């Protein structure tokens, strides 16, 4: 019975750590860039697009398709960075339970 109580306490502590990690993830922001920094965008931890910055040189007539491609590339860069940060935060929160056989792959 003592082992069960200990296991329950560990599970509750892990649940709190995971909730804290989700809060940290929601607050994070990552920047993605493309075109050598000509396009920058910021994604929130929720995946929401927060900001897009375009270099003024991209505002020239006929650059629309280039701008669109650069925005997509910057978004992909930011999304990759966000996924990496989210996984890192969740692995830290899960502690010894991260990567356990039989556990769902959440991060």
Curated annotation (Swiss-Prot):
Pfam families cross-referenced by the UniProt entry: YbaB_DNA_bd (PF02575)
GO CC term (a single one): bacterial nucleoid
Gene3D superfamilies: Nucleoid-associated protein YbaB-like domain
Cellular compartments annotated: Cytoplasm, Nucleoid
GO molecular function: DNA binding
Keywords: Cytoplasm, DNA-binding
Homology family: Belongs to the YbaB/EbfC family.
Assembly and interaction partners: Homodimer.
Record's function text: Binds to DNA and alters its conformation. May be involved in regulation of gene expression, nucleoid organization and DNA protection.
Protein name, entry field: Nucleoid-associated protein PHZ_c0369
């Amino acid at each position: 019975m003592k082992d069960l109580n200990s296991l329950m306490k560990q599970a509750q502590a892990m649940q709190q750590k995971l909730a804290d990690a989700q809060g940290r993830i929601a607050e994070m922001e990552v920047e993605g860039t493309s075109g050598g920094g000509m396009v920058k965008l910021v994604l929130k931890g929720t995946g929401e697009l927060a900001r897009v910055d375009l270099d003024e040189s991209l505002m020239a007539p006929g650059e629309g398709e280039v701008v669109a491609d650069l925005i997509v590339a910057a978004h992909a860069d930011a999304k990759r960075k966000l996924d990496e940060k989210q996984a890192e935060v969740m692995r830290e929160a899960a502690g010894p339970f991260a990567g356990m056989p039989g556990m769902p792959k959440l991060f």
